[in-house]
């Protein structure tokens, strides 16, 4: 399993198929699909496909993390280490 830890209970719940209170219901399916991609990845480069993931490294206070797009506003952010994802979170890190 590639996901070793979640940054918060909301992201963990979405991964488990739940729709937590306050979570945008219209994004649940896409978010869960993206989380499953992270979980299935054996190498970071696996997340370059499909291209609309827009895998990219983060900078500044999120240096050491990577992100993939859920939509124009939201991202799945995580730290990648030795083939596993840590501190996985669904977030709008621009706000």
Region annotations inferred by a language model:
Residues 38:
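Conserved phosphate-interacting/catalytic interface
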Residues 2, 10, 19, 43, ...:
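Glycine-rich, flexible loop/turn motifs
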Residues 42-66:
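A short, surface-exposed loop/turn module that caps and links secondary-structure elements
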Residues 1-2, 24, 42-45, 55-56, ...:
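Intrinsically disordered, low-complexity boundary segments flanking structured domains
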Residues 1-34:
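Arg/Lys-rich, positively charged N-terminal/basic patches that mediate binding to nucleic acids
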Residues 4, 28-31, 47-51, 69-71:
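Generic structural signal for well-ordered secondary structure
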Residues 58-59, 66-95:
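Enriched for short, Lys/Arg-rich terminal
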């Amino acid at each position: 399993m590639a996901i070793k830890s979640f940054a918060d209970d909301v992201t963990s719940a979405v991964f488990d198929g739940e729709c937590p209170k306050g979570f945008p219901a219209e994004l649940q399916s896409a978010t869960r699909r993206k989380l499953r991609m992270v979980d299935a990845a054996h190498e970071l480069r696996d997340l370059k496909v499909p291209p609309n993931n827009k895998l990219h490294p983060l900078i500044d206070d999120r240096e050491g993390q990577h992100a993939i797009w859920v939509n124009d506003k939201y991202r799945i952010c995580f730290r990648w280490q030795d083939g596993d994802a840590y501190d996985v979170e669904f977030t709008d890190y621009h706000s």
